[in-house]
């Protein structure tokens, strides 16, 4: 028999290479807070259902709280432990603290429903933080929209000057995009916020568990009724990663514009020294590292989304060890989007916009062509004829090196 918690039917010790290959403690230790929260409510339920005594419940509950404090204080090195994962790590610490009583913690529970619970609690906590950071960004963009309502700039299609727009309208466009992202995140929360605990490995438990009480105690809207579904799907992880990818796409596009605008060729925006870096060789350089890194990290988030989708696509019901591979991508996605949202708002607030130059550019380059076309339409000219006529005038103005207004007034 091995010394593993599940080792009763095994005659050989686990190969050291397999033990290392199988372990996830080095990265899933970030779930310790959620794991302890879930375990504390679980033992309260066991006492409520008379499976544990109140004294046993209190002993386990208090020891778990001590373990939480010790982990937060950095008393343990997760890279030097033999336990497979954070769940077994905490259970072993519990047994070391309170002896055989600690062995009762896992009564009526599998790691399958335990990890599913931890992930839902973790993504819920982080989702709330992402939502808060999105709200700050939306407020920042709203402020910029109001501040620059009257500041004209060239609008672009195909990165070519198209029509004049307000700089405020530009920021409002991104405000709308991030507002939809916020709505998507809140929709995800409604689907995710259900408890899997009590589903066991896949078929529940013969013990008289009160799943609804546990769900309510942990702040869930209810339980996942089908136990197979509760432990076997990671659609809530995939959906959060998908929302994160959408947010990163919008951040990347915003950053791309600001990178272009900060070049000498555009000169629409000046980077604050506190949010720019220099060159190790060229003393003249002022580099937009913040938006470049955000733009680059978007690809990283996309990659994690595709990886998790690919992991899940061929798995039979219910739980499979492949699903351990959801965590590193999820954790990195969450950490990446949080740091990007934390950086983008103060970065935007630090920028200085060259609004006089933007206005000058908006009033040159034949950006008034569409307005002139539509004025001809209002006078009764067919649209296609008006389009052809204004195009001919533009060609003539380019040849004469004058504006459309100058050409038309001269005519």
From Swiss-Prot:
GO-annotated cellular components: cytosol
| Reaction equations catalysed | 2-(N(omega)-L-arginino)succinate = fumarate + L-arginine
Its subcellular locations are:
Cytoplasm
Its GO biological process annotations read: arginine biosynthetic process via ornithine; L-arginine biosynthetic process
Question: Which UniProt keywords are listed?
Answer: Amino-acid biosynthesis, Arginine biosynthesis, Cytoplasm, Lyase
Would the keyword Cytoplasm be found if you checked this record's keyword annotation? yes
What would you give as a GO molecular function for this chain, any one? argininosuccinate lyase activity
Question: Could you tell me which pathway this protein works in?
Answer: Amino-acid biosynthesis; L-arginine biosynthesis; L-arginine from L-ornithine and carbamoyl phosphate: step 3/3
The record's section on InterPro entries has: Arg_succ_lyase_C, Argininosuccinate_lyase, Fumarase/histidase_N, Fumarate_lyase_CS, Fumarate_lyase_fam, Fumarate_lyase_N, L-Aspartase-like
Give the EC number(s) listed in the UniProt record. Answer: 4.3.2.1
Q: Does the keyword Phosphoprotein apply?
A: no
**By its UniProt entry, which Pfam families does this protein fall under?**
ASL_C2, Lyase_1
Highest taxon, organism lineage: Bacteria
Q: PANTHER family recorded for this chain?
A: ARGININOSUCCINATE LYASE
Q: Which family, according to the similarity comment?
A: Belongs to the lyase 1 family. Argininosuccinate lyase subfamily.
| Name of the protein this chain belongs to | Argininosuccinate lyase
